[in-house]
A protein has these predicted regions:
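Bacterial N-terminal signal peptides
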Residues: 13-24
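Secreted/periplasmic proteins
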Residues: 30-278
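N-terminal secretory signal peptides that target proteins for export/translocation
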Residues: 1-10
């Protein structure tokens, strides 16, 4: 019995020695040593959303746009910058030349894109002046609460879109806002038709070339979780692309938060068991 008690005592000391550095990362309170504190509510589990199915937006008129496009004709806005990136063309690496003769492998021949060449614009911006979110954003964006973003930080930028045109399926990332309006949440997240009758989605030259469509054609599109995106040409390029840079997936940060929460709960349970029981 004495030997067994000694072994238990040694095991307890070893566990305390291993976990003490972890306790030191939490704030101390009074004379009682470090206190482990946890959020009152666990962070959402991203794995629960991996198979989320979003509704289709059908027969939506698409137009072609590209990074570096100058204002002209109906287009009154320069595409050297996007609604979320003031240096869009610079960060992309140059001009996303739409001329088919100047393109190969769904990208310009003159340089390798530093961002995903498969991108789209939808007529909604969840942020106002990069400082705060639109009043309805937290209510209408299905994944908003998953990320609990800081004011002015977009939860729409980089989201994946599935597109369908004449029996071909393509995937792209949402990287700009438009065409024509940037507040049409009833269409983007609801069942309403686009407020603009001219177009409801802009697609990049890479999307155009993969699907074989031209400006003015109608397609179907819907949101899709990154876990449901297969590999393809849309997985080849870009630091904003989770296929290339896993840290670009916003769920990575949420998974970290969830793991930290679970670790804290385990530490709390361990400390509770180690505390002497009052007699």
């Amino acid at each position: 019995m004495l030997g067994c008690t000694c072994c238990e005592h040694v095991t307890r000391l070893l566990l305390i020695a291993i976990l003490m550095p972890l306790w030191a990362t939490f704030p101390a309170q009074g004379q009682g040593g470090p206190q482990v504190t946890s959020p009152t509510k666990p962070p959402p589990n991203p794995y629960h959303y991996r198979k989320t199915i979003y509704p289709w937006h059908r027969d939506i008129t698409a137009t072609i746009f590209w990074i570096g496009e100058k204002p002209g004709g109906r287009n009154k806005t320069s595409n050297h910058h996007s609604s979320w990136d003031g240096k869009w063309a610079v960060n992309y690496g140059g001009y996303d030349d739409p001329n088919p003769e100047a393109r190969a492998n769904f990208a310009p021949k003159s340089f390798r894109p530093q961002l995903n060449s498969f991108y789209v614009a939808l007529p909604y911006n969840d942020c106002l002046n990069h400082r705060l979110h639109r009043p309805e954003a937290s209510r209408v964006i299905p994944w908003f609460s998953r990320y609990n973003p800081k004011p002015g930080r977009s939860v729409c930028k980089g989201r994946w879109i599935q597109l369908y045109y004449q029996r071909k399926v393509c995937y792209a990332q949402w990287e700009d806002c438009g065409p024509w309006v940037t507040d049409d949440w009833k269409y983007v997240f609801g069942g309403h038709p686009p407020r603009s009758r001219q177009a409801g989605i802009d697609v990049s030259p890479a999307v155009r070339d993969y699907l074989g469509l031209k400006s003015g054609d109608k397609l179907h599109w819907r949101f899709v979780e990154f876990g449901g995106v297969p590999r393809g040409p849309w997985s080849w390029y870009g630091s904003n692309n989770p296929f290339v840079n896993p840290e670009a997936d916003p769920d990575v940060a949420v998974i970290r938060q969830l793991r930290q929460y679970l670790e804290q709960k385990k530490l709390e349970e361990f400390r509770r068991k180690q505390s002497p029981t009052p007699r």
